[in-house]
Amino acid sequence: MSIILIGFMGAGKSTVAKLLAEEFTDLDKLIEEEIEMPIATFFELFGEADFRKIENEVFELAVQKDIIIATGGGIIENPKNLNVLDRASRVVFLTADFDTLWKRISMDWQNVRPLAQDKEAAQLLFEKRMKDYSLVADLTIDVTDKSPEQIAELIREKWEIE
């Protein structure tokens, strides 16, 4: 059975997934393989609506495997994805206050985040998404003062993962 990590940009989903399993799936990487370009480029060329459609198709295939999945922060934007998450039995919501996440996003030069170019817009997006993250989560972890290793250990303990 899959463990699906959800949360806003900068929450540490990919980092924690790497600690939980050597073989994990970063949904953004699968999407980039499918579209054959960086997500930021796809957003620029085709827009968010087309991206969310492809994201859903790739996500529905990924959850059928027994793997750790680090999702993109906007996975909950598509109602179809909410249904998939609602049916999944191990969904972990990594959360923190907006200022903590914004600081992390601002310091991350490796990832281009099309929806995080403006702080005010990002904060509105954060506020909009928080409720949906909470609704589908089986486990919520506030990551503010925790290391990725501590977060991974909490998840392992919850589901007795080696």
From Swiss-Prot:
<keyword id="KW-0479">Metal-binding</keyword>
<comment type="function">
    <text>Catalyzes the specific phosphorylation of the 3-hydroxyl group of shikimic acid using ATP as a cosubstrate.</text>
</comment>
<dbReference type="GO" id="GO:0005829">
    <property type="term" value="C:cytosol"/>
</dbReference>
<feature type="binding site">
    <location>
        <position position="129"/>
    </location>
    <ligand>
        <name>substrate</name>
    </ligand>
</feature>
<feature type="binding site">
    <location>
        <begin position="10"/>
        <end position="15"/>
    </location>
    <ligand>
        <name>ATP</name>
    </ligand>
</feature>
<dbReference type="GO" id="GO:0004765">
    <property type="term" value="F:shikimate kinase activity"/>
</dbReference>
<dbReference type="InterPro" id="IPR023000">
    <property type="entry name" value="Shikimate_kinase_CS"/>
</dbReference>
<keyword id="KW-0963">Cytoplasm</keyword>
<keyword id="KW-0418">Kinase</keyword>
<feature type="binding site">
    <location>
        <position position="14"/>
    </location>
    <ligand>
        <name>Mg(2+)</name>
    </ligand>
</feature>
<keyword id="KW-0028">Amino-acid biosynthesis</keyword>
<keyword id="KW-0067">ATP-binding</keyword>
<comment type="subunit">
    <text>Monomer.</text>
</comment>
<keyword id="KW-0057">Aromatic amino acid biosynthesis</keyword>
<dbReference type="InterPro" id="IPR027417">
    <property type="entry name" value="P-loop_NTPase"/>
</dbReference>
<dbReference type="GO" id="GO:0005524">
    <property type="term" value="F:ATP binding"/>
</dbReference>
<keyword id="KW-0808">Transferase</keyword>
<dbReference type="InterPro" id="IPR031322">
    <property type="entry name" value="Shikimate/glucono_kinase"/>
</dbReference>
<feature type="binding site">
    <location>
        <position position="73"/>
    </location>
    <ligand>
        <name>substrate</name>
    </ligand>
</feature>
<dbReference type="GO" id="GO:0008652">
    <property type="term" value="P:amino acid biosynthetic process"/>
</dbReference>
<dbReference type="GO" id="GO:0009423">
    <property type="term" value="P:chorismate biosynthetic process"/>
</dbReference>
<dbReference type="InterPro" id="IPR000623">
    <property type="entry name" value="Shikimate_kinase/TSH1"/>
</dbReference>
<keyword id="KW-0547">Nucleotide-binding</keyword>
<protein>
    <recommendedName>
        <fullName>Shikimate kinase</fullName>
        <ecNumber>2.7.1.71</ecNumber>
    </recommendedName>
</protein>
<feature type="binding site">
    <location>
        <position position="113"/>
    </location>
    <ligand>
        <name>ATP</name>
    </ligand>
</feature>
<feature type="binding site">
    <location>
        <position position="28"/>
    </location>
    <ligand>
        <name>substrate</name>
    </ligand>
</feature>
<comment type="pathway">
    <text>Metabolic intermediate biosynthesis; chorismate biosynthesis; chorismate from D-erythrose 4-phosphate and phosphoenolpyruvate: step 5/7.</text>
</comment>
<dbReference type="GO" id="GO:0000287">
    <property type="term" value="F:magnesium ion binding"/>
</dbReference>
<comment type="similarity">
    <text>Belongs to the shikimate kinase family.</text>
</comment>
<keyword id="KW-0460">Magnesium</keyword>
<dbReference type="Pfam" id="PF01202">
    <property type="entry name" value="SKI"/>
</dbReference>
<dbReference type="GO" id="GO:0009073">
    <property type="term" value="P:aromatic amino acid family biosynthetic process"/>
</dbReference>
<feature type="binding site">
    <location>
        <position position="52"/>
    </location>
    <ligand>
        <name>substrate</name>
    </ligand>
</feature>
